[in-house]
């Protein structure tokens, strides 16, 4: 049987943290490595998700293009995965020709099969910016906890929100209150799939039970799915000029488009009637429904595609028993971890700490304890003492007649064989914790055997060879089974044994072994704790210093004169005015500030004709961070007063030269 293993597409709006590694990438890599170890044909598919509003927001804040953000974090994410020894056969990106073409083919086929239809919806619209606002472009007050919230989520209480639920909503670009307008979106008729999806889930024997239960609950109340968005950055909807495909309809198609990068063999893994293959999706718990309901619904709607056999859903990770938060820097980034510890230690800790489907915690103290008292004191102890003693006594692994082994020897070798079978079953069931526990138990048996045989006291050379041969057999089994979990450390063990990654003991000359498993020191842990607290305090300081946004109709907080002095207000003169393409409200203005000229985008269209603005002296905020409105960069802001529909530029009552400072 062929295997296709996929990992959730990493979102290119930041690097990877430990939560990503635990839920998705490490377990998928362990599973893939194990299948390869057993000689099975497997393709591991990964990549990055490059579209959606968070990326456009980051780009606007930094004054760059979305593709610049995508390129930066695609490369950073791949570097993080490489540092974790997570390897792929193909690693793609959704902002690529092959993906856009494949996604549009899927969409067109869904439409052709009658699963796409148009429907009017209500959506926030900003008059000043002349644009419909996606959920992340609206912020306001959470109606449940009264905390600051985004249009899709409240960070304070954790609730999912609709933008229209917000109290005092405002556009994040201009702070004005948006209005609700009707617009046409495209919907996927997912409700028509209810019976088909229920049958699929109920008849998927390899689907984990917790995933089945979650999917079946959703299927009971299945609704059609809005699959279009009024933004520019994304996969264009075929035949539509002003909307793109919602990321959750196009991103999973990346599993197909990225496999296509391997050439014609992609059909063997994805298309029906092309042979026996198994598809396993490794994801985080928060996107279980997307992969167990929405994605299979798309595949059923297309027709002719194989269905996922298993959606392997990893639980949430907390940090020191608190929810991780990237905005508060309460997070451990993969890069920071790898700069201080072996990636194998992280792979071990995450897989032994809890079953994959359960939520778990990362604590620096627990990490130190499990590495030092479990991995090193049990596995490290057996591997090191076996290698050191054998190399010192014989220089190579002894080979003996297995018929001469005594019962105690045969018992340990039998334990090796039963562990091999048990681990095989557990890994194929995605039960990585119990599989790793079996390896630890085998190492415990090895330590007990070594201690019981007391090879240092054996005078008979032949008997000593039998004992160390038996220990070497157990060591080979441990290395073989542990190699998928800890590829770096097991590669070093094989190097010292001068052996291949298999179960055969060849009697090769040994290299003088060094300590492979080094303990995590108290100083290491103290340093990491201090770094975490320092990063959190830095984030808190930034939050405190950040000026509060003023919403329409609200009074401003009282500020002191020093705070006001941070605003660079100057007299400017408008030189040129032209309309912003496809905008009903915006002008692109070139203003003279005396020592330089600035381009400013302002929502004065409708309030002033372009000709009457030319030559006017105005007041300009000059030290605002550049922002893009309708794709045009604005390098400042004109001051104006507004009352309902009346807009008036602030003017001087005496003539002053351009560039004059306002105090």
Swiss-Prot record:
Q: Name one Pfam family in it.
A: tRNA-synt_1g
Q: Where is this motif: 'KMSKS' region?
A: 323-327
The transmembrane residues are: none
Motif 'HIGH' region per UniProt: ranges: 10-20
**Compartments, record wording:** Cytoplasm
- Cofactor note (record): Binds 1 zinc ion per subunit.
The reactions it catalyses are: tRNA(Met) + L-methionine + ATP = L-methionyl-tRNA(Met) + AMP + diphosphate
Gene Ontology CC terms: aminoacyl-tRNA synthetase multienzyme complex; cytosol
Q: Does the keyword ATP-binding apply?
A: yes
Origin: domain of life: Archaea
Enzyme class comes to ligase
Please list the residues that bind Zn(2+). Answer: 142, 145, 154, 157
Q: Name one GO molecular function term.
A: ATP binding
Location, primary (coarse class): cytoplasm
Respond yes or no to whether keyword Ribosomal protein is given for this record.
no
Which UniProt keywords are present, listed alphabetically? Aminoacyl-tRNA synthetase, ATP-binding, Cytoplasm, Ligase, Metal-binding, Nucleotide-binding, Protein biosynthesis, RNA-binding, tRNA-binding, Zinc
Q: What is its EC number?
A: 6.1.1.10
Question: Which CDD domains does the UniProt record give?
Answer: Anticodon_Ia_Met, MetRS_core, tRNA_bind_EcMetRS_like
Domain tRNA-binding residues, every copy: 563-663
Name the positions where ATP binds.
Answer: 326
Purpose: Is required not only for elongation of protein synthesis but also for the initiation of all mRNA translation through initiator tRNA(fMet) aminoacylation.
How does this chain assemble? Homodimer.
For this chain, the family text in UniProt reads:
Belongs to the class-I aminoacyl-tRNA synthetase family. MetG type 1 subfamily.
Under which name does UniProt file this protein?
Methionine--tRNA ligase
């Amino acid at each position: 049987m062929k295997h296709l293993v996929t990992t959730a597409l990493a979102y290119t709006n930041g690097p990877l943290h430990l939560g990503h590694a635990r839920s998705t990438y490490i377990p998928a890599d362990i599973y893939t490595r194990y299948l390869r170890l057993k000689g099975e044909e497997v393709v591991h598919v990964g990549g990055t998700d490059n579209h959606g509003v968070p990326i456009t927001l980051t780009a606007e804040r930094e004054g760059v293009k979305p593709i610049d953000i995508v390129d930066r974090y695609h490369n950073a994410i791949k570097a993080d995965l490489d540092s974790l020894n997570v390897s792929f056969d193909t690693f793609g990106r959704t902002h690529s020709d092959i993906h856009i073409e494949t996604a549009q083919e899927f969409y067109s086929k869904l439409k052709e099969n009658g699963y796409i239809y148009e429907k009017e919806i209500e959506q926030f619209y900003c008059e000043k910016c002349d644009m419909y606002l996606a959920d992340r472009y609206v912020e306001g007050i959470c109606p449940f906890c009264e905390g600051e919230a985004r249009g899709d989520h409240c960070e304070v209480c954790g609730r999912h929100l609709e933008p229209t639920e917000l109290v005092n909503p405002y556009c994040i670009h201009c702070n004005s209150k948006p209005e609700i307008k009707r617009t046409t979106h495209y919907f996927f008729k997912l409700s028509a799939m209810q019976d088909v999806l229920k049958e699929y889930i109920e008849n998927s024997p390899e689907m984990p039970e917790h995933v089945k239960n979650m999917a079946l609950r959703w299927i009971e109340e299945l609704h059609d799915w809005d699959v279009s968005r009024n933004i520019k950055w994304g996969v264009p909807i075929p035949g539509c000029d002003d909307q793109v495909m919602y990321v959750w309809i196009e991103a999973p198609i990346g599993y197909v488009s990225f496999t296509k990068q391997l050439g014609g063999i992609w059909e063997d893994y994805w298309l029906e009637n092309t042979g026996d293959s198994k598809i396993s999706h490794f994801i985080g718990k928060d996107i279980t429904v997307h992969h167990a309901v929405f994605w299979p619904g798309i595949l059923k709607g297309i027709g002719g595609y194989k269905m996922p056999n298993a959606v392997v859903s990893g639980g949430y990770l907390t940090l020191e028993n608190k929810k991780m938060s990237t905005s508060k820097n309460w997070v451990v980034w993969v890069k920071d971890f790898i700069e201080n510890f072996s990636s194998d230690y992280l792979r071990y800790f995450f897989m032994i700490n809890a079953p994959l489907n359960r939520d778990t915690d990362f604590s620096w103290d627990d990490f130190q304890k499990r590495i030092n008292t479990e991995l090193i004191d049990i596995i490290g102890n057996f591997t090191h003492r076996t290698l050191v003693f054998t190399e010192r006594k014989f220089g190579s692994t002894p080979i003996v007649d297995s018929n001469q082994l005594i019962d105690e020897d045969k018992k340990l070798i039998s334990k090796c064989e039963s562990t091999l079978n048990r681990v095989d079953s557990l890994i194929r069931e995605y039960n990585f914790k119990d599989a790793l526990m079996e390896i630890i138990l085998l190492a415990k048996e090895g330590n007990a055997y070594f201690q019981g045989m007391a090879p240092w006291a054996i005078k008979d050379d032949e008997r000593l060879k039998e004992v160390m041969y038996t220990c070497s057999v157990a060591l080979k089994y441990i290395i073989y089974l542990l190699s998928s979990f800890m590829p770096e450390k097991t590669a070093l063990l094989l190097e010292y044994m001068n052996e291949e990654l298999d179960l055969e003991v060849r009697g090769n000359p040994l290299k003088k072994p060094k300590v492979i498993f080094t303990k995590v020191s108290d100083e290491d842990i103290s340093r990491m704790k201090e770094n975490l607290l320092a990063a959190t305090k830095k984030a808190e300081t930034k939050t405190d210093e950040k000026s509060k946004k003023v919403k329409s109709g609200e009074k401003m907080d009282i500020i002191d004169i020093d705070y006001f002095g941070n605003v660079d207000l100057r007299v400017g003169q408008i030189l040129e005015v032209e309309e912003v393409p496809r905008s009903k409200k915006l002008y692109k203005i070139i203003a003279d500030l005396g020592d330089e000229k600035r381009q400013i985008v302002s929502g004065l269209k409708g309030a002033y004709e372009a000709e009457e603005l030319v030559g006017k002296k105005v007041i300009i905020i000059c030290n605002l961070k550049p922002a893009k409105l309708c794709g045009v960069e604005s390098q400042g802001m004109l001051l104006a007063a507004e009352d309902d529909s009346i807009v008036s530029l602030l003017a001087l009552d005496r003539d002053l030269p351009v560039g004059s400072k306002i105090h």
